[in-house]
């Protein structure tokens, strides 16, 4: 059963700090996928006008993130909560530091009305200290099949213009872009004509983002519990994977790293040996036994973000969805996109580190 979406429309603020806060607030509309095997996460993680970088990280040959360092927010929900707990709950604050100390990616979507300016602002901040910005483009028409994370106002022509502005915001700077989580794995709800149109839009996005030669693109690759590798390979082949660096797995999901590596390796063999990244933010204990996707109990933080995976085809482990952000108001939990400090604490406490 789908839950209603809270529509959030915000004007573009003047400063980088205000832009980040506005985008973070707008991220409340992003949450559970219409397919119960996945959850789509928050649009951003705090304020990119203040932070640090983490790294350096080594990587295997053919990895554009080789040697990259990644940006860490100084004002993420985890950082703010940890700091507020420092005196009264010192042990718990130390646990939340496990989340606060790690880099996260920045989501941009339909809430970005001036996407070129927003991308430029985020790029300028996230690249401070030589860090590699990692962004998510999340605005494909009929996103989430009109479900909780839908964007009914985006048309194909508007999307092309949006992607062109997104690419212009990056310019010639180096960046990694995760392209449209759910767009390919979740395409089945569309008509045949709309499916063809989506594949064409994905191809356009890859070509546009890659035009500068400085952007590495990873297309939606779903996860091991959703579509077969053969199905995803066919969709990737028709979506511009030949021009992309590779694909992204497990975005906002809980499936364990080893399962993703096995699935990704099979998928890679079907798409010309392309590399992939894995969202490991919440997969430390794998998926819940009942496959619950909405704030499942007993989960844990997974491997921390790094480009030093020691796995030839895996370019990076990244926390694409911020651990502790609600998947939805299931079982009395906070609304989708809201920060849940106690849930985040549990993820941290159960981590293997």
Features from the language model and the residues they span:
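Bacterial N-terminal signal peptides that target proteins for export
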Residues: 3-20
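C-terminal motif of bacterial Sec signal peptides marking the signal peptidase cleavage site
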Residues: 28-31
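Bacterial signal peptide processing site
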Residues: 33-36
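Ser/Thr/Gly/Pro-rich low-complexity, disordered linker/stalk segments of secreted
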Residues: 38-61
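N-terminal carbohydrate-binding/catalytic regions of secreted carbohydrate-active enzymes
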Residues: 64-169, 322-326, 331-348
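Surface-exposed substrate-engagement region within the catalytic domains
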Residues: 72-99, 222-344
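Structural preference for beta-strand elements that scaffold enzyme active sites
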Residues: 105, 130-134, 174-178, 214-218, ...
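Active-site cleft segment of glycoside hydrolase catalytic domains centered on the general acid/base Glu
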Residues: 149-174, 181-215, 229-231
């Amino acid at each position: 059963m789908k839950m209603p979406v809270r529509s959030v429309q915000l004007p573009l603020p003047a400063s980088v700090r205000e832009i980040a806060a506005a985008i973070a607030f707008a991220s409340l509309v992003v949450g559970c996928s219409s397919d119960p095997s996945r959850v789509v996460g928050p649009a951003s993680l705090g304020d990119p006008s203040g932070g640090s970088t983490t790294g350096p990280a080594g990587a295997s040959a053919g990895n554009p993130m080789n040697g990259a360092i990644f940006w860490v927010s100084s004002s993420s929900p985890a950082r703010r909560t940890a700091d507020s707990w420092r005196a009264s709950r010192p042990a718990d604050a130390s646990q939340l530091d496990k989340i606060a100390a790690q880099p996260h990616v920045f989501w941009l979507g339909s809430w970005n009305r001036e996407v070129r300016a927003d991308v430029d602002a985020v790029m300028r901040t996230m690249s401070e200290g030589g860090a590699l910005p990692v962004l998510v483009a999340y605005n494909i028409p009929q996103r989430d099949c009109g479900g909780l994370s839908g964007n009914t106002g985006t048309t194909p022509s508007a999307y092309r213009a949006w992607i062109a502005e997104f690419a212009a915001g990056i310019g010639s700077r180096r960046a990694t872009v995760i392209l449209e989580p759910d767009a390919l794995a979740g395409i089945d709800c569309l008509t045949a004509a709309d499916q063809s149109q989506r594949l064409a839009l994905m191809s356009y996005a890859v070509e546009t983002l890659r035009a500068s030669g400085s952007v590495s693109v990873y297309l939606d690759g779903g996860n091991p519990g959703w579509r077969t590798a053969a199905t995803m390979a066919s969709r990737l082949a028709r979506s511009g994977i030949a021009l992309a660096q590779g694909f992204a797995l497990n975005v906002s999901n809980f499936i364990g790293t080893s399962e993703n590596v096995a699935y990704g390796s099979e998928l890679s063999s079907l798409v010309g040996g392309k590399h992939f990244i894995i969202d490991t933010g919440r997969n430390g204990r794998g998926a819940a036994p009942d496959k619950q996707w909405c704030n499942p109990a007993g989960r844990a933080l997974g491997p921390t973000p790094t480009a030093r995976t020691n796995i030839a085809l895996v370019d990076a482990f990244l926390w694409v969805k911020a651990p502790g952000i609600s998947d939805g108001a299931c079982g009395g939990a906070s609304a989708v996109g809201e920060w849940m400090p106690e849930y985040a604490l549990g993820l941290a406490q159960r981590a293997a580190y």
